[in-house]
Amino acid sequence: MVAFTVDQMRSLMDKVTNVRNMSVIAHVDHGKSTLTDSLVQKAGIISAAKAGEARFMDTRKDEQERGITIKSTAISLYSDLPEEDVKEIPQKSDGNSFLINLIDSPGHVDFSSEVTAALRVTDGALVVVDTVEGVCVQTETVLRQALGERIKPVVCINKVDRALLELQVSKEDLYQSFSRTVESVNVIISTYSDEVLGDVQVYPSKGTVAFGSGLHGWAFTIRQFATRYAKKFGVDKQKMMERLWGDSFFNPKTKKWTNKETDTDGKPLERAFNMFVLDPIFRLFAAIMNFKKDEIPTLLEKLEINLKSDEKDLEGKALLKVVMRKFLPAADALLEMIVMHLPSPVTAQNYRAEQLYEGPADDANCIAIKKCDPTADLMLYVSKMVPTSDKGRFYAFGRVFAGTVKSGQKIRIQGPNYVPGKKDDLFLKAVQRVVLMMGSRVEPIDDCPAGNIVGLVGIDQFLLKTGTLTTSETAYNMKVMKFSVSPVVQVAVDVKNANDLPKLVEGLKRLSKSDPCVLTQMSESGEHIVAGTGELHLEICLQDLENEHAGIPLKISPPVVAYRETVEAESSQVALSKSPNKHNRIYLKAEPMDEEVSLAIEQGKINPRDDFKARARVMADEYGWDVTDARKIWCFGPDGNGPNLVVDQTKAVQYLNEIKDSVVSAFQWATKEGPILGETMRSVRVNILDVTLHADAIHRGAGQIMPTMRRATYAGFLLAEPKIQEPVFLVEIQCPEQAVGGIYSVLNKKRGQVVSEEQRPGTPLFTVKAYLPVNESFGFTGELRQATGGQAFPQMVFDHWATLNSDPLDPTSKAGEIVTAARKRHGMKEEVPGWQEYYDKL
């Protein structure tokens, strides 16, 4: 066992070329935590007997009970590679010991914000795919996120034991199934890849794909088999690797290689992969599982596997585990693949810097990040907060991109809204301690150089969720993470005992710190609202809130859905509003924006912080906007980055710039709470046509302009055929054929519409994809399991906003009922006000 000390690891941290930061990502239940176990065991942290069952990285009690990962956990491992392997690494390295910082992330779709946080601080990803189920919706989502952050993937095809023992497939079928999976991963990679990253497709013949079983603790790459055979037959290893995959066949009679499936007499030949790689594995499985006592010793001798005396008495699965572990230890295959094919921080930061850093690409900090320079000014990105054993305190978990972080060092803590040169969202504080994250434990260290992943103590009070730490006064922030899911399910939380209210408020603060994608807010009527990405996510958050963060009994309302307000047409007449003192007037019209523009804003392709000329160019070329309009976008709303715009179409108005700030803040206010049901607006574009202002500055202050602009926005909105939008989940359901009927009946009952249904070749499984309104999704999983006898497993992820056709202003329609219910809940008058209420006559 390699029991290593913290000092050894600290000295490795300085050799940045020998560090690998990687995360493990996959679809739910494809076996990430189980696979991670065999790596952890190799590093001597859990015993070999437990690996595969311990799920060491699932540190929380509810994770062990539910058998799912909820939070991403980090651990540092130490590994030695043999000399001849080190020579073949395609990048610089120093010595043959390597430090691997590994983050195990959740696969469940509700927690994909945890995955985003894990990806930000790593450079490579191990994508785990189930042999039987193949590439699923969540595999695609996480892979897309990874490529968006310019992270290089390697693949491990897991659960091969299932294919051998449960499905009893033939060798050729198994090869075809592997090659289909690799093919579909490569399709995703080529769809979302980016030029800077280059070609990152995975090829078994190059050693970037491993095959194995996390539960049994064995895995192999083609490179390992090629090494064995190269020694045995005295041939070149590289040539052997290429021949062990794809259409190459070996004719044992003539001892010749060919790429035809038959020999000269027309007899079928066996594929090299099947013959040299799968055959020994299949033989072992057959001999052991059919209890052929006499064959086993000869096989083991051929494969050079020595059993201890007590292991010789085992039989069946127990013996299989021991033998396969000795024959093809999982950790060796995976560590070799990680070290050889994933980039070191030096290599990766070179091409990731411009995407991580908000400032210009030629400033000193960006260059330091590119070089991963430990002597430069500190640049550290905190991607999430990890709760400590000490109640209410958090470790800041992040990665040093440049410089060195030391305990006791004074640093600048820059929150997400910090702008260089200003004092907003900035704190100057000292780091108390620097620690190494080791699963559920932490180890203190003195300092940590660039390129490593680290935990910090003592700065949690100054950061909400994420932020940039630096010692340079001119540093811009690191770019904010984009989450692929949005919080669309909310509940109102209240205390059972009124004395506990302060505890609840404190608990909500802590909750929003500990989860990157939960929203907590207080509504106008005084309710405390918690919003999550789905039912499961919300359930875990509330359980944490009740037991950990607040520690008091709570009353929880039934879940409700967040809607959006939008318009269908241009305002039927110009909306006019006068200021309270009757001296200023604003004339405007509202109109809908294209869905693709709204999506581009939500995904950050059109960014309020970009240069307005460059942004106008993009909007004109890609979305067909008029260039002068695109240049005159005053602001995005709500929160300064939402999918609603104010466009200035006025001509020659005096004093216009003086009221710009008031108009902008009024628009943020109006779009945050629309006139119909007090929800956020979406895809609304407001064109200001004309403004009449009083000549005296004192009569056109914010107090005069803000209410006017808000009323005008509401009037224009209500004149433009208002509609409401509801969030829609994309549901992917895997099930056997006989259960498909049950799925359709449940979906029809819940206003779902089926998008596609296909059978996975080589398995009895069907995949059904459907759209399901979030409003109908509560209890969907339970009903589905009932209708299909527990054979169907749904995965739901937020997909898009769908406009409801009925009129929200008519209280008898479907939309009208939603509006009435929401207005009651928000404590507003039940009647929706008409546009006349906000419109002023000349």
Curated annotation (Swiss-Prot):
Q: Where in the cell is it found?
A: Cytoplasm
- Every copy of the tr-type G domain together lies at 17-346
Known EC number: 3.6.5.-
Which residues does the record list as Diphthamide (modified residue)?
A: H699
Tell me which InterPro entries the record gives: EFG_II, EFG_III/V, EFG_V-like, EFTu-like_2, G_TR_CS, P-loop_NTPase, Ribosomal_Su5_D2-typ_SF, Ribsml_uS5_D2-typ_fold_subgr
GO MF annotation, one: ribosome binding
Q: What is its main location?
A: cytoplasm
Question: Under which main EC class is this enzyme filed?
Answer: hydrolase
User: What keywords is this UniProt entry annotated with?
Assistant: Cytoplasm, Elongation factor, GTP-binding, Hydrolase, Nucleotide-binding, Protein biosynthesis
| CDD domains for the chain | aeEF2_snRNP_like_IV, eEF2_snRNP_like_C, EF2, EF2_snRNP_III, EF2_snRNP_like_II
The record's GO CC annotations read: cytosol; fungal biofilm matrix; ribonucleoprotein complex
Q: Which reaction does it catalyse?
A: GTP + H2O = GDP + phosphate + H(+)
**PROSITE patterns tied to this protein:** G_TR_1 (PS00301), G_TR_2 (PS51722)
Q: Per its UniProt record, what SUPFAM superfamilies does this chain match?
A: EF-G C-terminal domain-like (SSF54980), P-loop containing nucleoside triphosphate hydrolases (SSF52540), Ribosomal protein S5 domain 2-like (SSF54211), Translation proteins (SSF50447)
Name the protein family. Answer: Belongs to the TRAFAC class translation factor GTPase superfamily. Classic translation factor GTPase family. EF-G/EF-2 subfamily.
Q: Which PANTHER family match?
A: EUKARYOTIC TRANSLATION ELONGATION FACTOR 2, TRANSLATION ELONGATION FACTOR-RELATED
Name used for this protein in its record:
Elongation factor 2
What is the organism field in this record?
Candida glabrata (strain ATCC 2001 / BCRC 20586 / JCM 3761 / NBRC 0622 / NRRL Y-65 / CBS 138) (Yeast)
Encoding gene per record: EFT1
